[in-house]
Amino acid sequence: MMMWQRYARGAPRSLTSLSFGKASRISTVKPVLRSRMPVHQRLQTLSGLATRNTIHRSTQIRSFHISWTRLNENRPNKEGEGKNNGNKDNNSNKEDGKDKRNEFGSLSEYFRSKEFANTMFLTIGFTIIFTLLTPSSNNSGDDSNRVLTFQDFKTKYLEKGLVSKIYVVNKFLVEAELVNTKQVVSFTIGSVDIFEEQMDQIQDLLNIPPRDRIPIKYIERSSPFTFLFPFLPTIILLGGLYFITRKINSSPPNANGGGGGGLGGMFNVGKSRAKLFNKETDIKISFKNVAGCDEAKQEIMEFVHFLKNPGKYTKLGAKIPRGAILSGPPGTGKTLLAKATAGEANVPFLSVSGSEFVEMFVGVGASRVRDLFTQARSMAPSIIFIDEIDAIGKERGKGGALGGANDEREATLNQLLVEMDGFTTSDQVVVLAGTNRPDVLDNALMRPGRFDRHIQIDSPDVNGRQQIYLVHLKRLNLDPLLTDDMNNLSGKLATLTPGFTGADIANACNEAALIAARHNDPYITIHHFEQAIERVIAGLEKKTRVLSKEEKRSVAYHEAGHAVCGWFLKYADPLLKVSIIPRGQGALGYAQYLPPDQYLISEEQFRHRMIMALGGRVSEELHFPSVTSGAHDDFKKVTQMANAMVTSLGMSPKIGYLSFDQNDGNFKVNKPFSNKTARTIDLEVKSIVDDAHRACTELLTKNLDKVDLVAKELLRKEAITREDMIRLLGPRPFKERNEAFEKYLDPKSNTEPPEAPAATN
């Protein structure tokens, strides 16, 4: 910084040579620009001055460049003097000097660049035009060809009889032609009528007879630039549009092969914005990084193998599938599979989002689809991946434009259908797509010949979660005690996270690393993983949210009711932890259960889950004179389960084997059943919930002392684990149905459980 300041202080002497003349030259040009002489005379004068000053100005610029370059080269590097004791110091001094030379060299190159010349040209041009069109004040010098005052005109010329003719130009400028010399003097007036009266008065005082008085002629004279004024807004607008277009079109393309920055070109809105990936790009993800979805990975790998070695399949008469659609819940790895395909394939891979086809301009979506497939065919064999295809692939005729108006989304979908399976279809272009909602896609898009394979990627089971954990644990700095048995660690974490997707697992691993760093721990331990899992499931601990004693006691008995019900119900999920620490958005307490990976739920399981959900409210009813609003989420879950049992699962004798599911995603104005049936459904739902409430009340009434024990322990510790529950209540009277839980979390389960209290349904 000091070096730059020292050089900058030495520069002004050279920089002054950039001016276009000293004070004497400025005083020569300025009166010419501001004078009221005829325009052609001003232009001739300016032309002469420009001719005389051109050589001088170019010489000054060249001398500035030479002096500035010498200053850069000869200026000593103060930081590098006297530091020759080591190679490291010498190298750093050389690099500093090189950086300074590059910095000043770029400055001198800028002054010689075309951009600087254009800027100076525009500045000088606008200055000249503004000066020519702007009235100016009086100037010193000879009276000819300059602006006078009316008093000067009267005393110097009119009273002496030196004026032969007077011209009133444009009703505000008076030009007086002198006798014999043909010179012209001028002055401005405010009103023509007042000027004529003043002329008559002066000539009356001079006793000039009417026949000898000076004739006054009125003329209209336009400036060479006056005709531009009506077109000036249009010129500025077109010039601005041209400048913006040049800037946008000249922006460099993306590194991944996409369009340029900004709008991607004002006249290129119909171009595809797909990004190109190949083996030269920075995509480092391969199929080794994908775990937990082996079947889907095998399906996608076949596309890559076919493009790499088509002869293996063609000799058997097989053809490559035209496309595959990946569907499943968010976070299950659909986009990750596409990235792995881009990293493994030796063919061009074009990636685009479905929303990039949707624009405000009509026809842009279809144009981009055509351009995308044209680009893919030019690089065939190639792969196209369209993420979130439901943005353009929704079923036609639903949710479209009203009144039969043109729907841009449908036009885009029609073009996509034609490109995938039409007259110009290429067998060498494979289309992959991802969506979270395959149920809303158009049937024509999902048929064989377009998307031949429908690959469903569900949330991973315990084995899939274990494989995903093994992938993510490799990059973490774990406690040496944990690295000795990675299979056991990954299995335990997989058991602790039922229902987690690949994205949830990656988030939990990252949260564990962040928690360890927050506590300045050198390694990540199992305690950090447990805290991270709780953070992902229940939210952040709200330690600053202080509850009153009554609120805390109410929350403790509420959670104790849930825990005791779950402990003594056969089909309840294994309890892992109960806490009354506020978490997340409004949650004052929570209980963590570990449900097994199951795909069928019996009627008895539904009823036991409803009993456990009502345990919090029933515990409040048994221990407090008034209940609280803490059970509103429990009621919501109970109502949903009871309603599903009656309307869609056939678990109600009065409704029978009928389905009235209202959650099919389609809006219906009229219900598919009568009012009488609706009343019957309401009564059946209420009956199931009442039965669950009655059974829960009987169960907790028989175990009031156990509820008190758990609640007091919660008030003392704020969080209790499964070991605390065993210490307080004894082992569960039922064998756990979760095999992974017994293997990784409860290896010493009791083989002879005690008799369980009865729970009527």
Curated annotation (Swiss-Prot):
Give, from the UniProt record, the effect of changing residue 363 to A. Answer: Impaired maturation of CCP1
Species, as recorded: Saccharomyces cerevisiae (strain ATCC 204508 / S288c)
> Additional comments on file?
Present with 3870 molecules/cell in log phase SD medium.
Give the positions the UniProt entry annotates as the active site. 559
Q: How is its activity regulated?
A: ATP hydrolysis is coordinated within m-AAA protease ring complexes: ATP-binding to YTA10/AFG3 inhibits ATP hydrolysis by the neighboring subunit YTA12/RCA1, leading to coordinated ATP hydrolysis within the AAA ATPase ring.
User: Sorted alphabetically, which SUPFAM superfamilies does this protein's record hold?
Assistant: FtsH protease domain-like, P-loop containing nucleoside triphosphate hydrolases
| Protein name, as recorded | Mitochondrial inner membrane m-AAA protease component YTA10
Q: How is the cofactor bound?
A: Binds 1 zinc ion per subunit.
Q: Which cofactor does it need?
A: Zn(2+)
Q: What does this protein do?
A: Catalytic component of the m-AAA protease, a protease that plays a key role in proteostasis of inner mitochondrial membrane proteins. YTA10/AFG3 possesses both ATPase and protease activities: the ATPase activity is required to unfold substrates, threading them into the internal proteolytic cavity for hydrolysis into small peptide fragments. The complex is necessary for the assembly of mitochondrial respiratory chain and ATPase complexes.
Q: Upper lineage ranks?
A: Eukaryota, Fungi, Dikarya, Ascomycota, Saccharomycotina
* EC number(s) given by UniProt: 3.4.24.-, 3.6.-.-
> Which sites bind ATP?
290-291, 332-336, 472
Q: What is the effect of changing residue 559 to Q?
A: Abolishes proteolytic activity; impairs synthesis of respiratory chain proteins COB and COX1. No effect on m-AAA protease assembly. Decreased ATPase activity and maturation of CCP1
| Cross-referenced PANTHER family | AFG3 LIKE MATRIX AAA PEPTIDASE SUBUNIT 2, ISOFORM A, ATP-DEPENDENT PROTEASE
Enzymatic reactions: ATP + H2O = ADP + phosphate + H(+)
Q: What is its main location?
A: mitochondrion
